[in-house]
Amino acid sequence: MRGSLRVRAFAKVNYALEVLGRRADGYHEIRTVLQSVSLWDELEISGPEGRFGLVVEPEGAGVGPERENTVYRAWRLLAGEAGAPPVRVTLRKGIPAGSGLGGGSADAAALLWGANELLGLGLGEADLAALALRVGADVPFCLVGGTALGEGVGERLFPLPAPPEHRLVVAMPPRGASTAEVYGAYGGLGGAAPGGWSGRVVRALRAGDLGALGAAVGNDLTPVTAGLAPEVEKLLAGLREAGALGACMSGTGSAVYGLFREEAAAHEAARRLGGAAFVRVCRPVGRGLAGG
């Protein structure tokens, strides 16, 4: 019987990101603290259909060809491992592509969870998490969301206390750098000693201390991305000047964020921030997906 389901897929920020080294398989070992935030894509999944279809709104959202999209890759895994029939997906983008905010990972997680629910595939949490990791390192986190410490390539997840209530101003410059460019430049520099951000962030979260959290956020890759896209550092400086408790880049960028105690202060900072192609005020959320 044909049906449809809408799933909201939340973005993530990295309160901390440390690069610990390069593994034999070419991936980088990291330690990170991840937080879901109230910026989202929406997937409308319908099926079963005669063939897979993906429509992205708005056009030109920068998600790439269908066969390279994480949504398609997630469906192919479901088809191969669980016999999932084709579905039609309308993907409404609210998370900017190539931002380090996990939009592609969130979309894949939404497809895995949503198609499993819609089609009655009967996959459990462990099954979905295993498939999620085959799509990408951040996809397992996006399935569950909330606040977590991630290790390995980010797939080993340890839940953490939710942060004290606050607002984030998320901003993205007009141009950035790809993940491959950033890690390539990082490797070319020979890397650096990890910044130790995650330990300080974890202590701040466990203490429920927002000021300490703001002071602790950090990302080992910020100097690399800023070297490729100098606007990143300008946006970080603008957020600090606007009164952010702390400002940091998310993932490999080029999106950055600032933490604010009050919503009014966050909106004022967003209004005054110059040099951004994208600015939103959002808040932490306790899950990665919402739908039904």
UniProtKB/Swiss-Prot annotation:
Entry superkingdom: Bacteria
Keyword terms of this UniProt record: ATP-binding, Isoprene biosynthesis, Kinase, Nucleotide-binding, Transferase
Pathway(s) where this gene product acts: Isoprenoid biosynthesis; isopentenyl diphosphate biosynthesis via DXP pathway; isopentenyl diphosphate from 1-deoxy-D-xylulose 5-phosphate: step 3/6
Gene Ontology MF term list: 4-(cytidine 5'-diphospho)-2-C-methyl-D-erythritol kinase activity; ATP binding
InterPro entries from the UniProt entry: GHMP_kinase_C_dom, GHMP_kinase_C_sf, GHMP_kinase_N_dom, IspE, Ribosomal_Su5_D2-typ_SF, Ribsml_uS5_D2-typ_fold_subgr
One annotated GO biological process: terpenoid biosynthetic process
Reaction(s) the record says it catalyses: 4-CDP-2-C-methyl-D-erythritol + ATP = 4-CDP-2-C-methyl-D-erythritol 2-phosphate + ADP + H(+)
Catalytic residues, chain numbering: K12, D138
Amino-acid positions noted as binding ATP in the UniProt annotation, renumbered to this chain: P96, A97, G98, S99, G100, L101, G102, G103, G104, S105, A106
Gene3D superfamilies: 3.30.230.10, GHMP kinase, C-terminal domain
EC number: 2.7.1.148
Role description: Catalyzes the phosphorylation of the position 2 hydroxy group of 4-diphosphocytidyl-2C-methyl-D-erythritol.
HAMAP family: IspE
Family in the record: Belongs to the GHMP kinase family. IspE subfamily.
The protein, known as: 4-diphosphocytidyl-2-C-methyl-D-erythritol kinase
Species name: Rubrobacter xylanophilus (strain DSM 9941 / JCM 11954 / NBRC 16129 / PRD-1)
Source lineage: Bacteria, Bacillati, Actinomycetota, Rubrobacteria, Rubrobacterales
Gene assigned in the entry: ispE
